[in-house]
A protein has these predicted regions:
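TRNA-binding/sensing appendages of the translation machinery
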Residues: 50, 54-55, 80
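Short amphipathic alpha-helical interaction segments
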Residues: 54-73
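Accessory beta->alpha helical hairpin/"wing" motif in late/C-terminal subdomains of nucleic-acid enzymes
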Residues: 72-98
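A short, highly charged nucleic-acid-interacting micro-segment common to nuclease
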Residues: 43, 100-117
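Terminal low-complexity, intrinsically disordered regions
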Residues: 37, 65-67, 77-79
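Electrostatic, structured charged patches in enzyme active sites and in nucleic-acid/phosphate-binding
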Residues: 4-13, 117-393
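Short alpha-helical segments that sit at the start of domains
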Residues: 2-36, 106-110
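Short amphipathic alpha-helical interface segments
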Residues: 28-51
């Protein structure tokens, strides 16, 4: 007796069962689009924690793939990874894939992979195409490319730069950096040069930087640490935050970060959301106040859902120079309590309001995270894919 795994639409199931009965095979497992995406995510990320997988897919789907011996949980890494069986299934699926790598058990490598997986699963839930194998594929959007896929022995076009991912969405081309307590220092000039060189051919109106971590609190803990360094070539992320000329967004790798990515993926999202929120009270900002998104009853209004805190600070300073003691902020509920109230409302710098669900639906259509089609998997040619008999890994 041996088992065969078949990726096929439902009409093919009975034909397979008849064949399996004649050849004394065990019953097949039908792989869905969700199943294939789980396998592909693990190929791209190398390993993913249960938390991220269960939030993105169902635990039932994950455990089914485990029972089929296509994925396995590592007690050492406390994360899921692909087995040789899972890699063989992917190899027969027709998708372009990054090279398969053996699992790593070095703690620094595990930490980097799991952080990267948080960024990737957040982007996936936001409807971003994360399954890119070449930088040139960033021309389509929304899309996310992982530079580490091109870091190989003897070939490392990204050098020692620390960019975790490149994101092309809406009008923005973003370099994403993981910023959490004790993350270390960065050579900003090298980072910006690599960012420009590797994305120069990708059309985007604005380049930006995203600082990502598990929560806003983690990012701000590092930015507020105030470390001093002796190496003048390197800078702390706080120093980068203070001197960077590009827009800089803070993003948590969770549901709020997913919604934030969807918002910035809408071209001209700042003006559109300001108009939706203020309705008939909307007044365009003065031409010399680019940090404002509108005037609300004569008061500067800033749409803060993108979490560009430096733009908020600039708006506060500009308002004070105009003789105004406060501005008005609008943001997502999960941004208001942990960050904006403490920094702006409680210090008297701003009145802070929560963006309503109806306003978000008007901008986005739906606030629900992306979910793959609840359908069996077809190849790109529209045919059934029969995977050869697979031995247990």
């Amino acid at each position: 007796m041996f088992a065969e795994i078949v990726i096929a639409p439902e009409p093919a199931q009975e034909r397979f069962r008849q064949t399996a009965g004649k050849e004394r095979r065990e019953s097949c497992m039908m792989l869905s689009c969700s199943d294939l995406d789980i396998l592909r995510l693990l190929r791209w990320c190398r390993m993913i924690r249960s938390k991220e997988l269960y939030e993105t897919f169902s635990k039932y789907e994950v455990m089914n793939l485990c029972a089929a011996q296509m994925i396995r949980f590592s007690e050492a890494a406390k994360a899921w990874y692909l087995t040789p069986c899972g890699n063989r299934v992917l190899g027969s699926s027709g998708f372009a894939l990054p090279s398969a790598k053996a699992p790593t058990y070095r703690e620094p490598d595990i930490t980097r992979r799991l952080r990267l997986a948080q960024i990737v699963t957040t982007a996936y839930a936001a409807g971003v195409n994360i399954f890119l194998t070449k930088e040139s594929e960033l021309r389509s959007q929304p899309s996310l490319f992982l530079p580490f896929l091109h870091r190989n022995r003897g070939s490392n076009p990204w050098g020692s730069t620390r960019v975790a991912a490149l994101l092309h969405t809406g009008n923005l081309m973003c370099a994403i950096h993981w910023v959490s307590p004790n993350i270390g220092c960065v050579a900003l000039t090298d980072e910006l040069t690599a960012f420009q060189n590797h994305t120069a051919s990708i059309p985007a109106k604005q380049r930006a930087i995203i600082f990502a971590a598990s929560s806003y609190e983690e990012i701000l803990a590092e930015l507020d640490a105030g470390q001093e360094i002796q190496n003048t070539r390197l800078q702390t992320y706080r120093e980068v935050y203070d001197c960077l000329k590009l827009p800089l967004f803070l993003m948590p790798c969770n549901d709020t970060g997913c919604l934030q990515l969807r918002i910035i993926g809408v071209p001209n999202y700042r003006e559109l959301l300001a108009r939706i929120i203020l309705k008939s009270h909307y007044v365009p900002p003065p031409a010399d106040r680019a940090m404002y998104d509108a005037l609300y009853q004569g008061v500067p209004f800033v749409m803060a859902a993108d979490m560009d805190l430096r733009r908020i600070d600039a708006a506060v300073e500009a308002a004070r120079s105009d003789g105004l003691s406060q501005i008005v902020l609008a943001a997502l509920p999960e941004q208001v309590e942990p960050v904006l109230n403490r920094r702006y409302r409680e210090t008297g710098k701003a009145r802070v309001f929560t963006i309503t669900e109806s306003a978000l639906r008007e901008l986005l259509g739906s606030t629900a995270p992306y979910a793959p089609p609840d359908l069996p998997f077809y190849t790109s040619e529209g045919s059934v894919l029969d995977v050869p008999p697979l031995k247990a890994p």
